[in-house]
Amino acid sequence: MRPLILLAALLWLQDSLAQEDVCSSLDGSPDRQGGGPPLSVSVTSRGRPTSLFLSWVAAEPGGFDYALCLRAMNLSGFPEGQQLQAHTNESSFEFHGLVPGSRYQLELTVLRPCWQNVTITLTARTAPTVVRGLQLHSTGSPASLEASWSDASGDQDSYQLLLYHPESHTLACNVSVSPDTLSYNFGDLLPGSQYVLEVITWAGSLHAKTSILQWTEPVPPDHLRVRALGTSSLQAFWNSSEGATWFHLILTDLLEGTNLTKVVRQGISTHTFLRLSPGTPYQLKICAAAGPHQIWGPNATEWTYPSYPSDLVLTPLWNELWASWKAGQGARDGYVLKLSGPVENTTTLGPEECNAVFPGPLPPGHYTLGLRVLAGPYDAWVEGSIWLAESAARPMEVPGARLWLEGLEATKQPGRRALLYSVDAPGLLGNISVSSGATHVTFCGLVPGAHYRVDIASSMGDITQSLTGYTSPLPPQSLEIISRNSPSDLTIGWAPAPGQMEGYKVTWHQDGSQRSPGDLVDLGPDISSLTLKSLVPGSCYTVSAWAWSGNLSSDSQKIHSCTRPAPPTNLSLGFAHQPATLRASWCHPPGGRDAFQLRLYRLRPLTLESEKILSQEAQNFSWAQLPAGYEFQVQLSTLWGSEESGSANTTGWTPPSAPTLVNVTSEAPTQLHVSWVHAAGDRSSYQVTLYQESTRTATSIVGPKADSTSFWGLTPGTKYKVEAISWAGPLYTAAANVSAWTYPLTPNELLASMQAGSAVVNLAWPSGPLGRGTCHAQLSDAGHLSWEQPLSLGQDLLMLRNLIPGHTVSLSVKCRAGPLQASTHPLVLSVEPGPVEDVFCQPEATYLSLNWTMPTGDVAVCLVEVEQLVPGGSAHFVFQVNTSEDALLLPNLTPTTSYRLSLTVLGGNRQWSRAVTLVCTTSAEVWHPPELAEAPQVELGTGMGVTVTRGMFGKDDGQIQWYGIIATINMTLAQPSQEAINHTWYDHYYRGHDSYLALLFPNPFYPEPWAVPRSWTVPVGTEDCDNTQEICNGHLKPGFQYRFSIAAFSRLSSPETILAFSAFSEPQASISLVAMPLTVMMGTVVGCIIIVCAVLCLLCRRGLKGPRSEKNGFSQELMPYNLWRTHRPIPSHSFRQSYEAKSARAHQAFFQEFEELKEVGKDQPRLEAEHPANITKNRYPHVLPYDHSRVRLTQLSGEPHSDYINANFIPGYSHPQEIIATQGPLKKTVEDFWRLVWEQQVHVIIMLTVGMENGRVLCEHYWPVNSTPVTHGHITTHLLAEESEDEWTRREFQLQHGAEQKQRRVKQLQFTTWPDHSVPEAPSSLLAFVELVQEEVKATQGKGPILVHCSAGVGRTGTFVALLPAVRQLEEEQVVDVFNTVYILRLHRPLMIQTLSQYIFLHSCLLNKILEGPSDASDSGPIPVMNFAQACAKRAANANAGFLKEYRLLKQAIKDETGSLLPSPDYNQNSIASCHHSQEQLALVEESPADNMLAASLFPGGPSGRDHVVLTGSAGPKELWEMVWEHGAYVLVSLGLPDTKEKPQDIWPMEMQPIVTDMVTVHRVAESNTAGWPSTLIRVIHGDSGTERQVQCLQFPHCETGSELPANTLLTFLDAVGQCCSRGNSKKPGTLLSHSSKVTNQLSTFLAMEQLLQQAGTERTVDVFSVALKQTQACAVKTPTLEQYIYLYNCLNSALRNRLPRARK
């Protein structure tokens, strides 16, 4: 192996030496520096955008290797990115996978020996790619196309768009766009033209292109017209369409629905359609086409002419004319036939008719018939004519009738003729010659039965004789019997004979009768039937009938027929008991008979039971052994020969069988169930009757198939007797009576309220009678009866005491009545174990020592849970442990860390007690303060501001919890003594102590999320302490020098408190308050406020609470409860910061405050509430009113405890008994509740609960549900009104006291969305409700306290009662003291504000109130008319929240203006100076009471509106009419009320009695009507000048006091007033003067609406707020109530919606 390695090394060395020789020879060559001849390199993409192809030609021979390097170039021309390298010995190379359109740098290196390489650098660019998804489409306009595409891959510089015609290559558009442009719109193109779009992608000088072809849309053709050229052709015309290549014509046959299509070339504008159907409507559609586009133009409709009918033929018939023809080709709408000649007639026929008849008789003459064919607007006309001869017009006579007349005078005169006439018609009918000597004349072929006249004419034409006579009539045809409906009737009928007659005669005869035929009956010629009545049934008759005319009769026609037999009469069917048979009986019918046929049917189901033939003498028949309870029908008919009469029918029943096995059971206390078994046979129904003590109670009737029935609404626990009866028609059979009991009544629900070891059980009994029975309440423990107590029926409350906490028992109620007993479902009472008591936490640095007392009862263990509180409000679990002991050591804790400890007791029933939670903080390791800290700095000129510096007591001063300021006038002390901290300002000022504790405040340097201050300056001597002996920062003694020291306390409540002092400061002289500058005093006050806020925040944050161990005098005096007592005011501007601080750490500060309040007032006596006589009057046993504040009712005689009700007086903001808090009434205390309302003069009731929640009755329904009044004791309550909103309901009651005979109105406001033991969803809804309550209370100022209740009267009631004064305090003082408010509440009623969530919610409401800030002025500004409806809807949302907010702003604005006598800016100084001045002047003229003193106010209308003068008070005629004249009033409106004492005739002129004053004379002219409103026209004449003026007087409509007019009435009246004021030619309307003897709400409303309508009509805006404010500032107008303010908006909205404000001049 080694020789081989040595050989390889030698070979390598030899090759290296050879290369060195070559390189040495090259170094000496002349081409060394030049590098050899250059290369010729070419670069191309060869049509592929992602590759570059390099080729080169070497200038010198030799096979060299080549190295290639490729790098991309950026926009600046510099290489970047990864380079591609390649080696080759070829003369070309291709790079693949490049980015299209990108620039690249190429390096080609010739690798020569001895490192004599030659490198060529050049740049190149790949070819770009074409764009993707190129589209060219029409935009809907004939002159534009829109192109769109997706960008080309790779890089590009721009896109070039070339649009040209493909045939001529004429360029239409050439534009370049940036690569970011992906669409382009080409305009101004030729319609209907083909274009090619080329999109060229440029990348440097390289490009790639793609193209697309598209057409523009042609212009749609227009002015399409179609005209008919004949019966089978239509010609169309249209205007040429620009750009259209072809026109598509579609002709639609509107009758057949077929289409005819034709395509014509461009340039053609007309086309004729041939071979169409005559008389047919066609619709033509035209479409212009160019390329793929088709644009439809208008449509046109036209008819072809109808074709002519052929072969019109007129044919005369007897007495009429007949026409026929052949229809032409095609369609038609119909025919019109017009007959002209002696008779004119026009007839219209349908398109399918081909003949017509013109009825006669037609007179002879020449007739022409015109036949017109209709088709759309066109017609075709043909005519035909005919001559109608007289013979054709005369009616044809019946042949065979002969007229033979005698009495012809014989004469020898020749040439006589007999002329025949019809008596009824004037025409000549016959003319024959009469031979001389003839005595009769005969005519043949006449009408039978007709009346003729024959005139004998001489040869000279004279009538010598006239004869009349009749032809013989023909007999009636087809005589037959047509009806035998009744046994005593026959109806005959016949057909009239040809010819005429005057009547018919009919007679008849009974076969076998010896009497002559019956009466002859004459009938008229038009009668063809006769009914023969009162014939004998079952008899045969011969009937004869003939016709007669004049004295001639026809032959008689006879017919023989028989009447039917009569049915039997008085048929009856009844049941006979002895023997038990069903018996039928009847009476014989009149007429003939041979026998009776008797059939018996059973009706259900219909079955023939029996069929018998009885003799003609039979009158009854019986059936035995028929089934029971069935209904039978008997049919009896009479037989006579082969005839059978109609049957007589009747029904009857067999008696039913009684029900068997009757059984009665009680299914419910008020229900009995009766059942039975069906007996054999049938029945129609069952009747079950219920008796109680022999008195019928109820009856039930059921069907025959039923086998049971039930009775409801019975009396519980009662014995009843039941009678069951089977009915079959009128027959019945009863079963034996059965007795039964109803179950006794038991409560349908047991509701228990647990409290410690007792329970209050509400027993809910069903409504209705309680009935009878005995009940017991039973407690069971583990299945064994442990306690039993009798209950009275209906008892609704049960008190269970001395229950074992932590134990479970079951409660049931059992009741017995007779043999029955009932029981409720057991109610499991799981008694919650009591919480641990006397919890004490002793903190140390690394552990907490916890002690407690276990509650009594069945308890097992105590669960202790420990959580570490961290900043931000969260908590981390540490550990938990179960223990049966009463003490626990919690080790391994972190110093100066807060821990939340929760102790819960587990009862023997596995139920947990209420958790007792406390926060305990481990102490610091040890605080080692300096023996004496440096003296503090004192700021001069600020009332002695003492500055505490952070760190002045060492670096561990974070363990300091409290700082104190010690003041002294002793100039010799170096540091304070221990006794100084127990001396107060009172000891110093009045007892002569030289040193005292002036101020105590929490550590202000406690670490917080925000920055910690470096120092804290505290003003000293700023409070007015009076005689308080508590710690107080009182004024310093004037003229004394004071020194100050700082005291630091590590804790306040332990003997281990570490106390440190600073040295005293330099002495400073005190400053008298009188001598102190105002700015200094203000600064001091502000500083005090800041300190108070800071202390409050720190108190809330740290929540100090003392332990249970004994305390020395120092710690007792320094407890926060004692220090701050109950007053903890927070300025409104600091409330948000305080709220956020208290909310930190899971609301820890709120929790500690609430824990402090829990014990307040609990030790106060409640003896009256705990008295046994009053226990059942309390809804909950733990909510009992304190004796000192309870509301006492008037005691009823003989009832010593009737003065008790569960209610307390609560102080309000301005009165010690402003509010009454009470529980929701129980059923038995409703009367006491209304007594409370009446005796305490309550006018507003606030209800904060619903009647029932989650199945629990929270409050009894104590008011009427409808208009029917309800009486409780002496008080009757009427419901007057009820209005429901989303979150509350308003009601108004009228109370009537029967004994006192007095009435009073009370309003109830019920908040309906507040769950029990919870809070509303948002503070805004409750705040809006509070504002509503405040408005109602203001309206009833001084009329008694407000009554507030929920269910218990403490939780929701306490929250609401606390919110009322807190809101008032916030509005009046800009300060909130929630703690003190709740403290006072709990001193007057226990448990006020029941839960922590309610306490926090109270703060949330106040925070919302503060954050609302002042109302936006824009909300109450002018509103455009067009937006007014929207503004009304916005204000009405959320139960009128916007109106409430705006109204509060109005009241505040009115309050701000109170006392100011300055006139408004637009007041007219030349008119009535002011309302006060007017009162002063008029009071001199007429002395009247203050409330009736005259007052006048002017409301100017501006340059185009009318002025309005308002006069109030008892005005006489002189004052009224002279003011009318002075102010140029043209309209006078009187608002006098019916109860005013003024006499109308005193101020109004009468028709015959004008009013005359020193200035004017007033005449009554006439009564008129304006806009539907009655008015009086008055003429006023000025005495000196004689000038006249007409005044329109209108009377304001009357409505009840305190109510408003309906909007429609008021708006109609205002419209009438506006029209009166607008009369005349003046540009400015006449002045309106309104007079009212009293200041009323109606006056305010009228004045406001009158001005608002003027605004709307002239300015097109309205400003309700400003109008109401200006009017209220005037003396003549009252402040509107909230309801009136809303009424103004609604009334104005109605007016604008009805466009009432007409244009006014």
Swiss-Prot record:
Free-text function comment from the UniProt entry: Protein tyrosine phosphatase that acts as a regulator of energy metabolism by mediating dephosphorylation of insulin receptor (Insr). Prevents decarboxylation of osteocalcin (Bglap and Bglap2) via an indirect mechanism: dephosphorylation of insulin receptor prevents insulin signaling-dependent decarboxylation of osteocalcin, preventing the hormone activity of osteocalcin. May play a role in the maintenance of pluripotency.
Membrane-spanning parts: 1078-1100
Membrane topology: Single-pass type I membrane protein
Group of enzyme by EC: hydrolase
Glycosylation sites (chain numbering): 74, 89, 117, 174, 239, 259, 299, 345, 431, 551, 570, 620, 649, 663, 737, 851, 882, 970, 982
Protein name stated in the entry: Receptor-type tyrosine-protein phosphatase V
Organism: Mus musculus (Mouse)
Pfam families: fn3 (PF00041), PTP_tm (PF18861), Y_phosphatase (PF00102)
Binding sites annotated in the UniProt record for substrate: D1316, C1350, S1351, A1352, G1353, V1354, G1355, R1356, Q1394
Domain Tyrosine-protein phosphatase: 1150-1409, 1427-1695
Segments in the Extracellular topological domain: 19-1077
Annotated ranges, domain Fibronectin type-III: 37-129, 130-222, 218-305, 306-388, 393-454, 475-569, 565-654, 655-749, 744-831, 832-926
Known catalytic reactions: O-phospho-L-tyrosyl-[protein] + H2O = L-tyrosyl-[protein] + phosphate
